[in-house]
């Protein structure tokens, strides 16, 4: 089980990303658009720098829904490999069976 503080920190980051998503996307589009004036792009970059660091989507870490484990994460199931194997063996994940050939 991951430290509760790490899990909570990641949840706070998710909330910040959600709150600033629209503003972040708008400013990023202006800053990356080469057809815009250079000063307008610079202003957008400066405004992007004022947004909190944790509002950047790349700072959010994918974590297991059960344990909060950050590594060996399967996006499709939102679980780490340990929990995926455990729940699949117990038959709690529909459509997942142990491979046999």
Curated annotation (Swiss-Prot):
One Pfam match: Ribosomal_S14
**GO MF annotations in UniProt:** rRNA binding; structural constituent of ribosome
Q: Which GO terms describe its biological process?
A: translation
What keywords is this UniProt entry annotated with?
Ribonucleoprotein, Ribosomal protein, RNA-binding, rRNA-binding
* SUPFAM superfamilies xref list: Glucocorticoid receptor-like (DNA-binding domain)
Supply the InterPro entries for this chain. Ribosomal_uS14, Ribosomal_uS14_bac/plastid, Ribosomal_uS14_CS
Give the record's GO CC terms: cytoplasm; small ribosomal subunit
Q: Which domain of life is it from?
A: Bacteria
Q: Which family does it belong to?
A: Belongs to the universal ribosomal protein uS14 family.
User: What's this protein's function?
Assistant: Binds 16S rRNA, required for the assembly of 30S particles and may also be responsible for determining the conformation of the 16S rRNA at the A site.
Subunit description: Part of the 30S ribosomal subunit. Contacts proteins S3 and S10.
The entry's protein name is Small ribosomal subunit protein uS14
Native organism taxonomy: Bacteria, Pseudomonadati, Pseudomonadota, Alphaproteobacteria, Sphingomonadales
Question: Per UniProt, what is the name of the gene that codes for the protein in this document?
Answer: rpsN
